Amino acid sequence: MDRLHHPQLQTLVQTTSFHAQHEPTTPAVLCEGRTLTYEQLHRESNRIAHALKAAGLAPGDRVAYLGKESEHYYEILFGCAKSGTVLVPVNWRLTAPEVSHILQDSGTRLLFLEDEFGPVVEKMPAAPPETIVALGESFAAWKASHLDTDPKPHDVTPDTPVAQLYTSGTTGLPKGVVLAHRSFFAIRDALASEGLDWIDWRVGDIALIGIPGFHIGGLWWATQNFNAGTTVVAMRAFAARQAVDLIRDLGITTACVVPAMLRMMLTEPGVGAKDFTTLRKTVYGGSPISEALLEESLAVLDCEFAQIYGLTETGNTAVCLPPAAHVPGGSLMQAAGHPYPGVRSKVIDGEGRELPPGAVGEVCLATPARMVEYWGLPDKTAETLVDGWIHTGDAGYVDEDGYVFIRDRIKDAILVAGENVYPAEIENVLEGHPGVAEAVVVGAPDERWGEYVHAFVVAAPGQQPSPRDLHTFLVPQLASFKLPARYEFIDSVPRNPSGKILRRELRDRFWGDSARKVN
């Protein structure tokens, strides 16, 4: 298959018109048996752009979407881009007060709303946006009342804001991360500039998006495929059995998932290599992956794997572990990856001094895909974006070859008798035990040592490992101060809708409402 790269496309305004002209009948979106071609995507997004202008919205105004994945979401994405408005995708799993905060904080003027989330809006403590467009049966008529011709051009450059995504709010209220068009083109261009196929798009590709569109990973993966002119398979909400069936039945060639989704697919009864024969590449990221899960995934899916690392603030991926580095037992299997061409990395200490290779500190990234700002939070922006560098809040190091290794979130480090202990290291070893499906490690208060290591464990199906079994397994592999002092077995690990572990929820069992979660 031929690789696809269209360097003349530099904004999402250009994407649908280009592909409507060159491959009008190619499916752009497949969703629950419905097909939207590139010509249809172009025309329907034109209608939405005209409608937004008719509703009095001007470039820079915020437009929110509260609903699950569907072809309408992508029509609205491109309609916003063409009208100059900024799309605010809202996590549909949030409560009414949480949704209200996002709509109020962003200053949303118009809300696209799926019917099933109407009760959420009704319960919001603040007034809803001035205009609500229902995505039910009346939506087609609403669109049809507007022209499908190209809207009057507005001033747009790669630096023009196009989306505002809210962080998951694991440490306080969610912040609105403003992203420009360049966030969805810079990495594609970087790979093409060096002829790298770490992640690539090819003629005939059909891409599964398991990650929600309100998450940077889902939105980025969708736009990369639209920019290439390939087909996106949208899942209303991720379900492991459905994902496996879609891969097998639709002949899906690429997929973008978080590690938890890989685990769920592999543990579905009867699932095996026969279900993944058309896959050529799996892109994963969003949370740490254990070596055991990665090696099992490589064996069963039997395709190329690429890990992506980044933040919403970096415009998704800034670092990639390419397929060639995915060698079971290899030294790079624990790496986050290598910066793309044009992306720089460094590690700093608490005083902001750059550290040498191998020294652990805060990972910082300078990428052309980085955010514009935190919406309405200049002080927070200045803390995170310093002289072009995004301060990730992740503890890690860079090796002599430039590969980035992430140890953990800095705030998640456990301080045991003055020694920093990183949960991800312990979790990775624990999940290598055949009786462990998943493990989460947190620090709990200890009067003698400051903190002790507490391990939450989800047992593998049909297994009942004892704390003694796990301790015996860990002793040869970890220093004594890293060993969990206690093990607690749980049925499942709490996660947010993006698949990230809600570590704070587990930690708060020990620390309660204390603002200082360290002794």
Swiss-Prot record:
Keyword Mitochondrion: no
Amino acids binding Mg(2+): T167, E313
Pfam families (alphabetical): AMP-binding, AMP-binding_C
EC number, as in UniProt: 6.2.1.-, 6.2.1.47
Chain sites annotated for binding ATP: I216, T312, D394, K411
Organism: Streptomyces coeruleorubidus
Keywords assigned: ATP-binding, Fatty acid metabolism, Ligase, Lipid metabolism, Magnesium, Metal-binding, Nucleotide-binding
UniProt record similarity statement: Belongs to the ATP-dependent AMP-binding enzyme family.
GO MF entries: acid-thiol ligase activity; ATP binding; metal ion binding
Swiss-Prot/TrEMBL cofactor(s): Mg(2+)
Purpose of the protein: Acyl:acyl-carrier protein ligase involved in the biosynthesis of a unique class of isonitrile lipopeptides (INLPs). Shows a strong preference for fatty acids with a short/medium-chain length (C4-C8) in vitro, and accepts alpha,beta-unsaturated fatty acids such as crotonate, which seems to be a physiological substrate. Acts twice during the INLP pathway, catalyzing the activation of crotonate ((2E)-2-butenoate) as well as (3R)-3-isocyanylbutanoate as acyl-adenylates (acyl-AMP), and then the acyl transfer to the dedicated acyl-carrier protein ScoB.
Biological process terms in GO annotation: fatty acid metabolic process
Protein name: Fatty acid--[acyl-carrier-protein] ligase ScoC
Catalytic activity: a medium-chain fatty acid + holo-[ACP] + ATP = a medium-chain fatty acyl-[ACP] + AMP + diphosphate; a medium-chain fatty acid + ATP + H(+) = a medium-chain fatty acyl-AMP + diphosphate; a medium-chain fatty acyl-AMP + holo-[ACP] = a medium-chain fatty acyl-[ACP] + AMP + H(+); octanoate + holo-[ACP] + ATP = octanoyl-[ACP] + AMP + diphosphate
